[in-house]
């Protein structure tokens, strides 16, 4: 089940990014006093009272040359589309503005839980000034100071009350996967081809997908799949669906819900920076990854074309050397019959458990081939290894000093483990731990 989502909305320069960073617990956005400067990440995760959740800062979604009020309106609509709970941020220093009233009207009609956070209430004397915000019709205003961290806990206490119930059980036998990629790489056509039906409206114009609906289906062998459709940008999407940060955000949410990610590239266009950014997030999240090169039927080929394209992918995605690459065409159905089987294989590899005796044989053989490094005269000693988790496979290696395990040596051990066992399509984690 996906994490509950909080969206932070409000006009520019009310302190949305400061509150976003406070909730996330780290300073991950660039924050200045000039309106409209939020850059970098607009989507992250947080935790409060034992509940994990996702956070969206809608102010980070650049809507280009749209008029000021239209931008604010559409950011509020994004929040309504994406969030379980909305935090509406206003400024206690400036009072209610026309832009605040516009956002309040949109949110009031949404039937989503809205928490009104009056920011920049930096001292107790200012608390008496927040009563005017009752006029927005959104219930009790919460006085907060993003810069000092005051009142944030009260806002989160209220947010958690509105989170959806997490008692829903998921079918462990169902493989959940998503197709992610830039607009116009052919995600919708691939979905239709995999399902064998015209479930999604498809055209050659970027951003024509109308909706995002998850789909269950079974293979001929009886394996259950849940396809998480990220192609859709909702009916309002024509305004902002090609906005890079918005589409990246949607991809991140899909990755969060998936076991396996199909990273779709356009054979005609090659690899773009956005592809690398989203693939990096899937890798860091520990998801299984398959690289799908679509529209292969449109490429002029010779005997080296596929090999050259694969070499380019390996060069651009060096950290995904474990991910299988498949060249397909949604139009001609080329190699599409191999996708479900490949997804099943990656799922099996994600769940693979290695007996400790076998694992330690491989690790000790690796040390014999390439002795452990030294640092300032002190040598790393490896005592034993054990697997502690799957999805992704995670190995704890007990050592004398954790700091002596350099990244390069951990990578060497990972490569030796991969040579010995089948982990195609899944990242694996190596965690050094000091033996007590």
Swiss-Prot record:
Native species: Enterococcus faecalis (strain ATCC 700802 / V583)
- Kindly list the positions annotated as binding GTP 1: 10-17, 57-61, 119-122
Q: What is this protein called?
A: GTPase Der
Coiled-coil residue spans:
none
Q: Which residues form the EngA-type G domain?
A: 4-167, 175-351
Classification via PANTHER family: GTPASE DER
What is the role of the protein in this entry? GTPase that plays an essential role in the late steps of ribosome biogenesis.
Q: Where does GTP 2 bind?
A: 181-188, 229-233, 294-297
Question: Which family would the database say this protein is a member of?
Answer: Belongs to the TRAFAC class TrmE-Era-EngA-EngB-Septin-like GTPase superfamily. EngA (Der) GTPase family.
Entry keyword Thylakoid: no
Q: Which InterPro entries match?
A: G_ENGA, GTP-bd, GTPase_Der, KH_dom-like, KH_dom-like_a/b, P-loop_NTPase, Small_GTP-bd
Q: Quaternary state and partners of this protein?
A: Associates with the 50S ribosomal subunit.
Keywords per UniProt: GTP-binding, Nucleotide-binding, Repeat, Ribosome biogenesis
Q: Where in this chain does the record put each KH-like domain?
A: 352-436
Do the record's keywords include Ribonucleoprotein?
no
| Cited CDD domains | EngA1 (cd01894), EngA2 (cd01895)
- Which Gene3D superfamilies is this protein grouped with? 3.30.300.20, P-loop containing nucleotide triphosphate hydrolases
A molecular-function term among this protein's GO annotations: GTP binding
Example GO biological process: ribosome biogenesis
């Amino acid at each position: 089940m996906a994490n509950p989502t909080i969206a932070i909305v409000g006009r520019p320069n009310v302190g949305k990014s400061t509150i976003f960073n406070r909730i996330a617990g780290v300073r991950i956005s660039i924050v200045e006093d000039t309106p409209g400067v939020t850059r970098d990440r607009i989507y992250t995760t947080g935790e409060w009272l034992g509940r994990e959740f996702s956070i969206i800062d809608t102010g980070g979604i650049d809507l280009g040359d749209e008029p000021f009020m239209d931008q604010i309106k559409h950011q509020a609509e994004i929040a309504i589309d994406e969030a379980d709970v909305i935090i509406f941020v206003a400024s206690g220093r400036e009072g209610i503005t026309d832009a605040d009233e516009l956002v309040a009207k949109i949110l009031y009609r949404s039937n989503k839980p809205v928490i009104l956070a009056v920011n920049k209430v930096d001292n107790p004397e200012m608390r008496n000034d927040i009563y005017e915000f009752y006029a927005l019709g959104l219930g009790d205003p919460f006085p907060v100071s993003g810069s000092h961290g005051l009142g944030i806990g009260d806002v989160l206490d209220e947010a958690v009350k509105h989170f959806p119930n997490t008692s829903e059980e998921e079918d462990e036998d169902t493989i959940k996967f998503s197709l992610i990629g830039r607009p116009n790489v052919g995600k919708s056509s691939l979905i239709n081809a995999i399902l064998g039906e015209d479930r999604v409206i498809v055209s050659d114009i970027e951003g024509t997908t109308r909706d995002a609906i998850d789909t269950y289906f079974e293979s001929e062998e009886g394996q259950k799949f849940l396809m998480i459709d990220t192609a859709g940008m909702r009916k309002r999407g024509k305004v902002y669906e090609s906005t890079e940060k918005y589409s990246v955000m949607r991809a991140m949410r899909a990755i969060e819900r998936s076991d396996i990610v199909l990273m779709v590239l356009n054979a005609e266009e090659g690899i773009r920076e956005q592809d690398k950014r989203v693939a990096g997030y899937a890798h860091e999240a520990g998801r299984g990854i398959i690289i799908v090169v679509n529209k292969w039927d449109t490429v002029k080929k010779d005997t080296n074309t596929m090999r050259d394209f694969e070499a380019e992918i390996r060069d651009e995605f060096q950290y995904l050397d474990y991910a299988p690459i498949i060249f397909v065409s949604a139009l001609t159905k080329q190699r599409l019959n191999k996708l479900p089987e490949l997804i099943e294989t990656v799922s099996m590899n994600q769940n693979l458990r290695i007996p400790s005796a076998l694992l330690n044989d491989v690790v000790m053989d690796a040390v014999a081939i390439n002795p452990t490094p030294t640092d300032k005269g002190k040598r790393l000693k490896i005592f034993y290894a054990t697997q502690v988790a799957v999805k992704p496979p995670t190995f704890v290696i007990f050592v004398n000093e954790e700091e002596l395990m350099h990244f390069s040596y951990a990578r060497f051990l990972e490569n030796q483990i991969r040579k010995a066992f089948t982990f195609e399509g899944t990242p694996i984690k190596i965690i050094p731990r000091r033996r007590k």
